[in-house]
Amino acid sequence: MKDRYILAVESSCDETSVAILKNDDVLLTNIIASQVESHKRFGGVVPEVASRHHVEVVTTCFQDALDEAGLEASDIDAVAVTYGPGLVGALLVGIAAAKAFAWANQIPLIPVNHMAGHLMAAREQKELSYPLMALLVSGGHTELVYVPKAGEYHIIGETRDDAVGEAYDKVGRVMGLTYPAGREIDQLAHQGRDTYDFPRAMIKEDHLEFSFSGLKSAFINLHHNAQQKGENLVLEDLCASFQAAVLDILLAKTKKALAKYPVNMLVVAGGVAANQGLRERLASDITETEVVIPPLRLCGDNAGMIALAAAIEYEKHHFAGWDLNAIPSLAFPNYKE
């Protein structure tokens, strides 16, 4: 049987990425051009800057992916692209590039939801067993998703305000840490103790919603008041206390979801899934359900995860027309229960 190759494009935020998937789950290449250095001085992603960077490097990423995989454009059977959620200008660059490649080679165009991509990144780690529960944690999203079968998603809980990754970056900025702050906070937390009392919003309530704005505000107020009084705060203990509160919230809601929905496994994915503290808590706290987490290289935004999600859509012949457009606030295919 002839091998099938899907080329995937990801440009929803500040990473330009092109990957090539062989058959169902073999990633041949996953080119990522990061813009982190360009956005550090702003303390966050500037949409217009991100879009311009995508334009500058996307063509090179295409060629690098083909070269690294040892393939020609004519070998590609389909093109997948993230069409939301994300920054509209950034998304449009990837969509335009994917359309051009698909049109030039007369091959199908596969639309992929960015968050479905994060979830399906776990496919490279292990074959997924349905039904499953997914905890998706990133800079823009915090969601619990029930997945009864491949390609069907039901959001059963989400954040009411800040995403968990956003909270990390905001408190990191207050402490003067470099953007993005998640990794540094995680490292500092492992050197400190949970000595500061931060709130765990809605942790005892039965619903599956998250909230991190109160925790973020409590952290900022504590830091501000200490500065006003000239008090010294222990940075490592601050990070340890903040992270302990975050993880308590995430684990409490995840356990409630697993109790309500019988599943075969728990997938934890998204940029925050790279957090070592989270991985340690999952290993110690979730013992009756198999936990699957993508490898570190597939936790952040990348086209490899888009390709892995696209393979499922390809089998369903879920192709887009040439009128495919960016949807910045794109939701999962199913309505929230």
Curated annotation (Swiss-Prot):
Alphabetical list of InterPro entries matching this protein: ATPase_NBD, Gcp-like_dom, KAE1/TsaD, TsaD
Enzyme class: transferase
Binding site for substrate: 136-140, 169, 182, 186, 275
Binding site for Fe cation: 114, 118, 301
Essential cofactor(s): Fe(2+)
Compartments it resides in: Cytoplasm
Keyword Cell cycle listed: no
GO cellular component: cytoplasm
EC assignment: 2.3.1.234
The protein's role, per its UniProt record: Required for the formation of a threonylcarbamoyl group on adenosine at position 37 (t(6)A37) in tRNAs that read codons beginning with adenine. Is involved in the transfer of the threonylcarbamoyl moiety of threonylcarbamoyl-AMP (TC-AMP) to the N6 group of A37, together with TsaE and TsaB. TsaD likely plays a direct catalytic role in this reaction.
Protein name per its UniProtKB record: tRNA N6-adenosine threonylcarbamoyltransferase
